[in-house]
Amino acid sequence: MTSWVLIALSLFVVSAAMALRTNAWRGAIARVAARGGGDGSMVPITVLVPVRNGADELAALLQDLHAQGHPRALTEVIVVDDHSEEPVQRLVSSMARQWPQLRYLPMEEGAGKKAAIMAGVRAAQHELVLLTDADARCAPGRVAAVAAAFQAHPCDLLLLPVRTEGDGLCGMLQVEEQAALLAALVGTWSEGRPMLANGANLAFRRTAFEAVGGYLGDVRDSGDDVFLLQRMRRAGRTVEVAVDAALWVRVQAAPSCGEALTQRLRWAGKMGAVRDPVSGLVSLVALLLPWALTVFTVLAVADQRVGDGLLRTWTLLLAAWAAWCVPLVQVTGDVHRLAGEERPRPVRTFAALLAFTVYAPVIAVVSRLYRPRWKGRRIR
């Protein structure tokens, strides 16, 4: 066996292992999607909205929350104002005149989203807390579906789905990336090692949040979702996932590539603080695999000669490429279908995955060296 064949075989084995894992994720997504909810009609719930500026987006979200089908008397909504420079207080106060369950909570101590969430949890009247970003949109059945999911699958932390909407090349990349990340969220949860969460749609029990210390001691500004997940895991708390149609929230993609890059630098910075060696190693292999396939393909084209196991090398190499990309495209398509989006576009998904393999390692490195500004503040 020549060195060419041996390397191609090694790459195929790794790709096949990744394909098996991704196919297992597809099965997990199907099982989670098939689960039903319980009767949450009498479950009280607090919806927590930390906000800094973005009054127009907040107004749209509050309209969605006001239209919820869950009993209004059981649905408390708290808007925690993180020192906004826009008229957030005026907006909330005007709506609260006709909506007594809506509360405005200005932050008196500290700053940042984590401090805002902790202030909101302290003020919450109910045990079940639903966290949502101020720029998210949701369907009228969202709150009721969250309550039903907690009834059917009792847990301390509930991971919920987020769909990104966007136009143009940059928007398309973000849409596909978010779908792939949601697949990874459900997949790693099914493996017993959940790594991802999204603060735009997250629910937890107030007593569990307080028991793990909330965000006490966290020095990073971002990462409220992932750090809470890691704290819950370390404390042995129960983590569940639900993806029912009514649970989805929609967020707009960053309008420009520059803003999308800044957003990803912020996200990558928080992932560097996650302490899970096994999952980290597997993620590193998954990130580097397409690079290894690309480098070996280029070398094979440039240097391999007839007689060096040419046929076997290229058979294994093509199989490795297929084992890497086909399951990823399929699982991303599964998420698109769950989100009720238009018919999945495998070519578009494949192109976005290729782009992700190029920019993800670069962002991971740059995020260690550079902290972007977010909402007027330098991220720590």
Where on the chain are the PLM-derived regions?
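N-terminal membrane-anchoring/stem segments of glycan-assembly enzymes
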Residues: 1-39, 184, 353
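Membrane-embedded multi-pass helical conduit in multi-pass membrane proteins
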Residues: 7, 23, 282-370
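Short, acidic, metal-binding catalytic loop of nucleotide-sugar glycosyltransferases
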Residues: 63-74
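A conserved acidic beta->alpha catalytic loop
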Residues: 78-91, 109, 136
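Acidic donor-binding/catalytic loop of UDP-sugar-dependent glycosyltransferases
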Residues: 86-87, 134-149
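Glycine-rich, basic loop-to-helix element that forms the pyrophosphate-binding segment
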Residues: 107-124, 145
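Short aromatic/hydrophobic "clamp" motif used to bind/position activated sugar donors
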Residues: 129
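Catalytic donor/gating beta->alpha subdomain of glycosyltransferases that bind UDP-sugars
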Residues: 150-153, 157-182, 210, 216-279
